[in-house]
From Swiss-Prot:
ATP-dependent RNA helicase involved nonsense-mediated mRNA decay and ribosome biogenesis through rRNA processing. It holds the Pfam family DEAD. It catalyses: ATP + H2O = ADP + phosphate + H(+). GO terms for molecular function: ATP binding; ATP hydrolysis activity; RNA binding; RNA helicase activity. It comes from Botryotinia fuckeliana (strain B05.10) (Noble rot fungus). Residues 546-574 are annotated as: Disordered. Residues 182-357 form the Helicase ATP-binding domain. This is ATP-dependent RNA helicase dbp2. GO terms for cellular component: cytoplasm; nucleus.
């Protein structure tokens, strides 16, 4: 990390955290009354702009995934008098101090991981009955000796202390992923589960985890967790914690949630007291292990939730480092909405003779309960189109709408615009402080602020019931992100609506989008269909695609960011 010498040093490079350069960290010399904030341009961050269009360079940006900070700019935007050295390489260096584990399983204590006892009613079902049930519920399985699915909660054979909590929730029957996933996970085998967001997969691994914990020896002082759940975002990690807290209450199972963006103190105290379950994002967990605050020697049940999203976000090196700290005979459950080659490779490397359950086709497809409306517009029409849709949607005061933008800057700009126009909108993205993100999510969940603006980083971690509409102000980089975005609505058997503004800038994605719409039997705008003739073949997974950047640095002062603190305009619209 270098501060840039000479005539106008650059700001500190990006990379101290996920894709965020520091805001105005090293401001150059006395010219700097307006030096732009340093990086924080998301996944593919460029350096912050310099004073007067380039005098005195801005902070260095991240590389393609925002992990390696670029050098600070020099006088005259980088050439000139002594540009800064290379920026921090924090994320890629994470785990460099982890001790290599040499596992001699013959000297390690044995542990129980097979708990499934097939109910006589399930055992009596013929293969024909089982095949019919799987076909009705779009369940496909792969692998040898896969247990039959269960059709009721009682058939799953959970102990009474688990069943009490399940029945208290009032669920009518297991979801398809639970029907097949519970017997698989309870059998102690490594499992891959592919299912859409909102399919009930969290409970599919939570309940077997509770059974697993209760069969293990009690934690001794200094022991790390027995169950480790890795998740891509803070919001998803908190959601998982809520489920584990709810269903582990009667067993007095302790848990903690370990993620960045908040002070470490409370997390360190939880780990020191001892927790049976740790839900974590990869970066903060490695930090805790490297600093000796916890260890993974006791982990015998590992969950990788939303594995595809973690890889999309560039966490693969960190995941591999973490998995190297866990005994290889553990039970591993990997859950994903999609099954691309990168996820397949990870499963092949770290899961042992796994069995697999897929809900629906392995071809990426949208939830058919969601009505998809795609409008071809010009860039300057977007705000007007959005306002017109909002006026119609918010005629029903119970509606909730989640608006997606491509960058943090646009998210903040749109939020200010809507608030000044009288709409109760709030925004959430990676540059917001954790307490602000929590507050925004709560305002949205409770309906106090029924309009939330978000970037893709937040898209997977947001679990809010009864989102009636998703609005894509900016189209994402690829059709996978599109499907994940619109999957925020139409959950748990409900219907939903997704409205997307599509411009000529998105033309390369037209063919992929039309394929998604066609598969879901949606109406296709003729102008969109016309684009497919000229637009090329689409962008695939887009690992090195256009950065989500553009947002300003976090900036000091105040409890909440300026966009969320913008006053509502006089003509309240809701």
């Amino acid at each position: 990390m270098s501060y840039g010498g000479g005539y106008g040093g650059g700001g500190r490079g990006g990379g101290n955290g996920y894709g965020n350069g520091d805001s105005s960290y090293g401001r150059g010399n006395s010219y700097s009354n307006g030096y732009s904030n340093g990086g924080s341009n998301g996944y593919s961050g460029g350096g912050g702009g310099g004073y007067g269009g380039g005098r005195g360079g801005g902070g260095g940006g991240g590389n393609v995934n925002g992990y390696s900070g670029g050098g600070g700019g020099g006088y005259g935007g980088g050439g000139g008098y002594g540009g800064g050295g290379a920026g921090g390489d924090r994320m890629n260096n994470l785990g460099a101090n982890l001790q290599k584990q040499n596992w001699d399983l013959s000297t390690m204590p044995k542990f129980e991981k097979s708990f499934y006892k097939e109910d006589p009613v399930v055992a009596a079902r013929s293969e024909e009955d089982v095949a019919k049930f799987r076909a009705q519920h779009n369940i496909a399985v792969q692998g040898p000796n896969i247990p039959k699915p269960v059709e009721t909660f009682d058939e799953a054979g959970f102990p009474a202390y688990v069943m009490t909590e399940v029945k208290a929730q009032g669920f009518p029957a297991p979801t398809p992923i639970q029907s097949q996933g519970w017997p698989m996970a309870l059998s102690g085998r490594d499992v891959v589960g592919i299912a859409e967001t909102g399919s009930g997969k969290t409970l599919t691994y939570c309940l077997p985890a509770i059974v697993h914990i209760n069969a293990q020896p009690l934690l001794a002082p200094g022991d790390g967790p027995i169950v480790l759940v890795l998740a891509p975002t803070r919001e998803l990690a908190v959601q998982i914690q809520q489920e584990i807290t709810k269903f582990g209450k009667s067993s007095r199972i302790r848990n903690t949630c370990v993620y960045g963006g908040v002070p470490k103190g409370g997390q360190i105290r939880d780990l020191a007291k001892g927790v049976e379950v740790c839900i974590a994002t990869p970066g903060r967990l490695i930090d805790m292990i490297e600093s000796g605050k916890t260890n993974l020697r006791r982990v015998t049940y590992l969950v990788l939730d939303e594995a595809d999203r973690m890889l999309d976000m560039g966490f693969e090196p960190q995941i591999r480092k973490i998995l190297g700290q866990i005994r290889p005979d553990r039970q591993t459950c990997m859950w994903s909405a999609t099954w691309p080659k990168e996820v397949r490779a990870l499963a092949s490397d770290y899961l042992n003779e796994f069995i697999q359950v897929n809900i629906g086709s392995l071809e990426l497809s949208a939830n058919h309960r969601i009505t998809q409306i795609v409008e071809v517009v010009s860039e300057f029409e977007k705000r007007d189109k959005m306002t017109k849709h909002l006026e119609k949607i918010m005629e029903d005061k119970d509606n909730k709408i989640l608006i997606f933008t491509g960058t943090k800057r646009v998210a903040d700009d749109i939020t200010r615009f809507l608030r000044q126009d009288g709409w109760p909108a709030l925004s959430i993205h990676g540059d917001k402080q954790q307490n602000e993100r929590d507050w925004v999510l709560n305002e949205f969940k409770t309906g106090k602020s029924p309009i939330m603006v978000a970037t893709d980083v937040a898209s997977r971690g947001i679990d809010v019931r009864n989102i009636t509409h998703v609005f894509n102000y900016d189209y994402p980089n690829n059709s996978e992100d599109y499907i994940h975005r619109i999957g925020r609505t139409g959950r748990a058997g409900q219907k939903g609506t997704a409205i997307t503004l599509f411009t000529t800038d998105n033309q390369k994605q037209a063919r992929d989008l039309v394929n998604v719409l066609t598969e879901a039997k949606q109406v296709i705008d003729p102008r969109l269909a016309e684009m497919t003739r000229y637009g090329g073949g689409g962008g695939g997974r887009g690992y090195g695609g256009r950065g989500y950047g553009g947002g300003r640095g976090r900036g000091g002062g105040g409890n909440f960011s300026s966009s969320n603190a913008a006053p509502l305009g006089g003509g309240r619209r809701w």
